[in-house]
Amino acid sequence: GKNRYGDLNKVASFGDAPYACLVTRNVVMQRITRDQARKFAFDWRDKPLLHVQPGESFEIETWDAASGFFKSPDDKAIPANRPGFDRHPPLANPIGGPVYIEGAERGDVLLIDIEDIEVGDYSWVAIGPKRGPLGESTRWPELSGEHTTKIIKHTPGPSGTMRDGTMQFNDKISWPITPFIGTIGVAPDREVATSIDGQGMWGGNLDIRDVAVGNRIHLPVFHEGALFYLGDVHASQGDTEYTGTAAE
């Protein structure tokens, strides 16, 4: 469907050191669907959903960080009302994977070239008490008030797609859609890391806006096949999630 928060075509290559790769495309691109992208951990025990060759592009359709919970301003980020928040850590921030890259071995370096990201027709921002770096700010105490959800509509650009589209905050404020991948990585060596809190040299929930189209990500390989995951695609973000979320 068109209501997608993040479809990614990715090129990967690997070796004892990073090297450039020749992009090749299959007649039918392999794909992980949104319904399959419901993992909540980077787990080396997961069965791969795709097997790809080095240099092969593939696509992952993702859920937003709340698995579609936020659809209107009436949907608040109150933990007691959110599915999966009765677990510790919460079952939030779903990712798609793992993807098995043929020939990848422990000690290799996996290169991920982000070719394309397509977002859906809206995103959301949810703020509430003590959420994010500004959650206890004395300068902006309103950011730690009641739970508030903002739905941001997306409009297509001249291309007819969201690739050059606009985010409409209100009648007076808008800005370009600038999507990136919030959570990306491979299965860690020994531990199992959650997709909501886990971070390390293997990747994780990084929320860095530079993980975007045209950029290359380098990740160490700890397991045969690399076991690559991604999710938590954002339509826009500043330098961090100051109130606990970006435009999800």
Regions found by a protein language model. Give the residues of each.
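N-terminal, Lys/Arg-enriched amphipathic/low-complexity engagement segments
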Residues: 30-87
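Short, well-ordered loop/turn sites that connect or cap secondary structure elements
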Residues: 52, 101-104, 211
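Short, Lys/Arg- and Gly-enriched loop/turn segments at beta-strand edges
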Residues: 65-76, 117-127, 225-235
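Intrinsically disordered, low-complexity linker/loop segments enriched in Gly/Pro
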Residues: 116-212
